[in-house]
Amino acid sequence: MILRKHSYFRYICILIYSCLMPALLHSQNVVKQISNADGLSNNSVNCFLEDSEHTLWVGTWDGLNAYNGRSFKTYSYNKKDAGSISNNVIWQIIEQSDSILWVSTDYGVNRWKRSTQQFTPYYLGTQNNPPKQEKSFLLGITSGKHIICYVKEQGLFCFDDRRQEFVSLKNDLPDDIRNFVIDSKDRIFFLTGHGQLLHYQLTVRNSCLKKKSGTVPPFPIFIFPRTASSLTMTGR
């Protein structure tokens, strides 16, 4: 009787294993290397993002690429096309919603609309004076999905979705901002060229920043990558 029970149990285990094995094999991660030989516009990649539609966006030194798992679609500047991206050097890609992406370039930030596949460029005071530095346009997004943009030598801006334009945010920031991040509580951390970390609280409704104190570390900061739940600072 005991032997029969063991045989029956073993039969059930084999049956379950046989049913699950194909699914387990199918679920294994697949690593695939992609390059300009596969349609990528340039092998020098500056940024990438997987959006809510599972499209992989890749920003390079020569164009923005959308990869659907099979092929690339490349977006490049075309002076004859008013709906093209403003510049081919891509630095940041941010998803505001499932239909809107924001892309920062060496000359302007761009709002891309999925339904039209068109870009709307915003130059924020640099139309007649293109920036001479790389990464002059820095993008961030708040918990309420508001787009924030810092432009070197121009200041800090917030995009007004109703008016479809950027409005200036009152601030006392220095001129040497290198980068910034916004956390889940809408606290903004600005990194200066001297490695100083500045902490502000953002209030979009009042179009202003409120400076916080007591958060500057006693050592210079050079990079501060952010995850969904934490901010990591790296110094000397």
Predicted features and spans:
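Carboxylate-rich, polar loop motifs that coordinate divalent cations or form catalytic acidic clusters
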Residues: 1-236
